[in-house]
Amino acid sequence: MSAWRAERVVLAAIVAAAMATPAVAAPDTYDPARYRVVLEHVTARRTELGARYAAARSGQARAAIRNEARRFVVETLVSQVFPAWMGMPSGGGPQATASLPHEPGMYISCSYFLTAALQNAGLVLESRARFSQAPAAWIERALLPPGGQIHRYGNLSAGELEQRLVALGEGLYVVGLNIHVGFIVVRDGHAWFVHSSYTPPGTVVNEPLTSSMAIDLSRRKGYWVSPLFQDDRIVELWLRHQPVPAPPQWKGVWSPEPGSL
């Protein structure tokens, strides 16, 4: 069973009361028309940067454009995409696969939130379903270049984990937990966990990592952390509008043992 499916089992026990209610309306702060403008800007910016990248004639020029694209994607995710998804109800089943924030009648699971956010920021995925239904570490490996490192931290408190993440450097990361996956943003000496939470309040949240129930619940099994948009491969794929190859189709039986993600 993948993290996506295992999460649903725990979700029923932890937030049954919350999930018994219908999907809530989009918060007043979410403006669908404004978000469409954000998505259009992402497309236009990727097209403009991609054209410049294709025309660049030196390695130095290409590196500068990659860095410009990297900054744009990360800042767009943090300042535009993540805020738009806040409050979207978490859930399971075929209604948990929303592609845009606050789609009427829809929920969002942890891995489908991760893939939707990446797609909203202009990243093309070979198969959203295969990404979203794979174990967390498979998702991370697919987003990393060949040989890219997944940092494994075992039995650390949330405070200790935050210290390790801050030591890795500011930026965006993917974290796999025992039955969960999400984003981590490291800025100004602190780490924030952005995810579709299977713990209360049962919505997409941006919370301090040190106070996250989902982080605490994974302490015994550990945490798997990988950098996102910090290597040239994924930035080049974004610039060229080329798909990130998907993980293999997951057909195994999920196990919570360390490394099984």
Model regions: which residues?
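Bacterial N-terminal signal peptides that target proteins for export
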Residues: 2-11
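N-terminal signal peptide c-region/cleavage motif recognized by signal peptidases
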Residues: 20-22
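N-terminal capping segments
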Residues: 25-132, 257
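Bacterial N-terminal signal peptides
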Residues: 10-18
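...with weaker cross-activation on analogous glycine-rich loops/strands in unrelated enzymes
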Residues: 133-206
